């Protein structure tokens, strides 16, 4: 509640807010992630209780904004590997995760995501 007076402008939730058991700066390789039926990442409710019942980061963002600060989240590019393995449907599309994923496009330090072909319009529903 006193951050703004000390020059803070932004509050950013760092990576792996969608991983229920993240507890340190170490990644859990191939950990289960929280996502909706379309493979879109959701906040882990056990770590962000205000996200319950589909609220997402809305309540937390509103609180941060009420303090006069800006709210953001760290996101990784691509589609969750878990969505590809489950072959989730892509929102507003007749396509599925395996059709848009570039499984050879991976991040060397984080195993959560596969790349998505940016030229492939079928992948826009995951964004």
Say what each PLM segment does.
Residues 1-127:
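Aromatic-lined carbohydrate-binding/catalytic grooves of carbohydrate-active enzymes
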